[in-house]
Amino acid sequence: MSIRLYKSYTPGTRNRALSAFSEITTDKPEKSLVKKNHRNKGRNNRGVITIRHRGGGHKKQYRLIDFKRNKYNISAVVNSIEYDPNRNARIALLHFTDGEKRYILHPNNLNVGDTILSGKGISLDIGNSLPLEEIPLGSSVHNIELIPNRGGQIVRSAGTSAKILAKEGNYVTLRLPSKEIRLIRKECFATIGEVSNNDAFLIQSGKAGRTRWLGKRPTVRGSVMNPCDHPHGGGEGRTPIGRTRPLTPWGKPALGKKTRKTKKLSSAYILRRRS
């Protein structure tokens, strides 16, 4: 992937850096693999805001992605590489030999016309999905299962990959993109390679409107709110927060407070917390 830089012709193009979309091969998705995407705009079933700063944005159709990769030992050919408005990674359309079509996350260096497989005892080619116990140490993998047969749940964002560090007993040790080191069952499947669009972190929208197109609403500082809206609010002019430490809008400690549950079951499988 490459980044397209814009000259300052207008205020909206100043500091703009967007994807060049050079790897995209088609602009129309497979009709059988899209469905209506009901956007709740950060509200729950009662209409109460549960996630702030969401709303608006362009309409999107959801692409059905195959995270399970459970068509074992049936080869598929990469037919196209497409843009997905619901994620920052690209997706690849597969045509299986039995006639079925599926979308997967597009790995780097997987091209149109390549053949991939999923199952046990297969080759270690880019895009192939196989159990962690069959992947050699030092390999980069993505779309990793946490529980066998549940489908990939971690390492799915653009440009990410995990590295296999060790194998011992029924578990494989992986280093995740967050530098967290954790154990995962050896029967869990993972896909060889790194997720595509690894320059996504370089993208700059250049203007507020482009961020609104993505469905993101403005984030307002607590110090400029009223005291009924935020613990930092109120006062005459620019006043200090008036507290011993920064707080969230709900009065909980912010900036450095660990929020992970202390009795979470998966904590036993985390050898080193993320940095």
Swiss-Prot record:
Organism, as annotated: Thalassiosira pseudonana (Marine diatom)
Listed GO CC annotations: chloroplast; mitochondrial large ribosomal subunit
Gene3D superfamilies for this protein: 2.30.30.30, Nucleic acid-binding proteins, Ribosomal protein L2, domain 3
Record's subcellular location: Plastid, Chloroplast
Subunit structure as annotated in this protein's UniProt entry: Part of the 50S ribosomal subunit.
Major localisation: plastid
Family stated for the protein in its record: Belongs to the universal ribosomal protein uL2 family.
InterPro entries referenced in this protein's UniProt entry, alphabetically: NA-bd_OB-fold, Rib_uL2_dom2, Ribosomal_uL2, Ribosomal_uL2_bac/org-type, Ribosomal_uL2_C, Ribosomal_uL2_CS, Ribosomal_uL2_dom3, Ribosomal_uL2_RNA-bd_dom
One Pfam entry name: Ribosomal_L2_C
Annotated keywords: Chloroplast, Plastid, Ribonucleoprotein, Ribosomal protein
Gene symbol of the encoding locus: rpl2
Keyword Ribonucleoprotein attributed: yes
Annotated SMART domains: Ribosomal_L2, Ribosomal_L2_C
GO molecular function, one term: RNA binding
Protein name as annotated: Large ribosomal subunit protein uL2c
